[in-house]
């Protein structure tokens, strides 16, 4: 069966850059990787095809040979080049699927989300959390063996991986004899069935520092899942989710809030009290204050969890229209409104005057 064109395999043009090749290979490998498609022979074949195509096209010398001679360039061998390290591309996405020593493995990382009120996030808090996880089997002490005896795998010699030669390419894959463990267990533990780990719940006390924000993560080293065969456990990542607050909205270390005032307060000026994180504060509103005016209270925001500097509190004035008026109040407002009649009204409502002038100018242009 003839091989497909390497560029076609990765879905890129022949002018593709090194970065384009890397992105295309990453998409292809993640789609067809055997760990995501267990038992799917077609996916495994597609994965190998993608890997072979990338190893050639990502190497400058090999790509030049391929562009000139096609697949025939490699029928009798090919010179060595700077073939990219697959581990550099994927890191830990598939747990070093392309190689690496068995001793470098560790347990899986665990994620946990904790919800806080804004006040808790600002001040810091200590929380007790309970997480489902895999822990070391106490019956076999993590060995997976009922009698504690394990044999080094003779196929991979304890590495958990075997080297496969496919033409000019050498690949590492999980040892089929020991399943990647590097050891053979003849008498599996009756409690964990040879896994060396059992499901359990772990209770931890997590100290959340003052100033954390929505999406911040706290890493607890070694508190993740216990690794197989006694290898170190992974880490626990506690992600912070801050609930919406009825008064404040947070923007980094700054806080924002709306301060409702009456029309009379905005027109005549007044002193209003506003809530802050550490009590009340006063804002002096000058006469003729418009809705939307911002007042800044320095240092009344959130103390940064990283720099220990404090943000500010921004208070936005909202001039409220009075509701549920009495007959007397309505009469007074009607009398007040009459005082704005005529040309003098423009000087009392500059924004309205500007708006009306703009509307008139617009219609004049439309009808001219």
Swiss-Prot record:
Its main location: cytoplasm. Binds 2 Zn(2+) ions per monomer. It holds the Pfam family DnaJ_CXXCXGXG. Gene3D superfamilies: DnaJ domain, Heat shock protein DnaJ, cysteine-rich domain, Urease metallochaperone UreE, N-terminal domain. Zn(2+) 2 binds at residues 153, 156, 175, 178. Zn(2+) 1 binds at residues 137, 140, 189, 192. It is found in: Cytoplasm. Keywords: Chaperone, Cytoplasm, DNA replication, Metal-binding, Repeat, Stress response, Zinc, Zinc-finger. A zinc finger (CR-type) spans 124-201. CXXCXGXG motif repeats lie at residues 137-144, 153-160, 175-182, 189-196. GO terms for cellular component: cytoplasm. Residues 5-70 form the J domain. One of its GO terms (molecular function) is zinc ion binding. Its cofactor is Zn(2+). SMART domains: DnaJ (SM00271). Belongs to the DnaJ family. The J domain is necessary and sufficient to stimulate DnaK ATPase activity. Zinc center 1 plays an important role in the autonomous, DnaK-independent chaperone activity of DnaJ. Zinc center 2 is essential for interaction with DnaK and for DnaJ activity. Participates actively in the response to hyperosmotic and heat shock by preventing the aggregation of stress-denatured proteins and by disaggregating proteins, also in an autonomous, DnaK-independent fashion. Unfolded proteins bind initially to DnaJ; upon interaction with the DnaJ-bound protein, DnaK hydrolyzes its bound ATP, resulting in the formation of a stable complex. GrpE releases ADP from DnaK; ATP binding to DnaK triggers the release of the substrate protein, thus completing the reaction cycle. This is Chaperone protein DnaJ.
């Amino acid at each position: 069966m003839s091989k497909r064109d390497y560029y076609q395999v990765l879905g890129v043009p022949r002018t593709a850059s090194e970065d384009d090749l890397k992105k295309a290979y990453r998409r292809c490998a993640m789609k067809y990787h055997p760990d995501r498609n267990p038992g799917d022979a077609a996916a495994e074949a597609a994965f190998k095809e993608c890997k072979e195509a990338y190893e050639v096209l990502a190497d400058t010398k090999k790509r030049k040979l391929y562009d000139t001679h096609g697949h025939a360039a490699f029928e009798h061998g090919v010179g060595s080049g700077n073939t990219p390290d697959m581990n550099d591309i994927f890191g830990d996405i598939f747990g070093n699927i392309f190689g690496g020593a068995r001793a470098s493995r560790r347990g899986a990382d665990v994620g946990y989300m904790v919800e806080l009120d804004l006040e808790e996030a600002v001040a810091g808090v200590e929380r007790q959390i309970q997480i489902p996880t895999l822990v070391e089997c106490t019956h076999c002490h993590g060995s997976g063996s009922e009698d504690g005896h394990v044999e080094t795998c003779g196929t991979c010699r304890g590495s958990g991986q075997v080297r496969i030669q496919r033409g000019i390419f050498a690949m590492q894959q999980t040892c089929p004899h020991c399943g990647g463990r590097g050891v053979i267990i003849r008498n599996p533990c009756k409690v964990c069935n040879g896994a060396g780990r059992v499901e359990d719940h772990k209770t931890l006390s997590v100290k959340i520092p003052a100033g954390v924000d929505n999406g911040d993560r706290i890493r607890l080293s070694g508190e993740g899942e216990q690794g197989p065969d006694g290898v170190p456990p992974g880490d626990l990542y506690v992600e912070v989710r801050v609930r919406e607050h009825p008064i404040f909205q947070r923007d980094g270390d700054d806080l924002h809030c709306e301060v409702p005032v009456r029309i009379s307060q905005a027109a005549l000026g007044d002193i209003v009290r506003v809530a802050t994180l550490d009590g009340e504060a006063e804002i002096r509103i000058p006469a003729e204050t418009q809705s939307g005016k911002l007042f800044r209270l320095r240092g009344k925001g959130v103390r940064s969890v990283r720099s220990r500097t404090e943000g500010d509190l921004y208070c936005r004035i909202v001039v409220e229209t009075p509701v549920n008026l009495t007959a007397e109040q309505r009469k007074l407002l009607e009398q007040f409104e009459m005082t704005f009649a005529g040309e003098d009204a423009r000087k009392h409502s500059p924004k309205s005057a500007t708006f009306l002038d703009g509307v008139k100018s617009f219609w004049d242009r439309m009808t001219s």
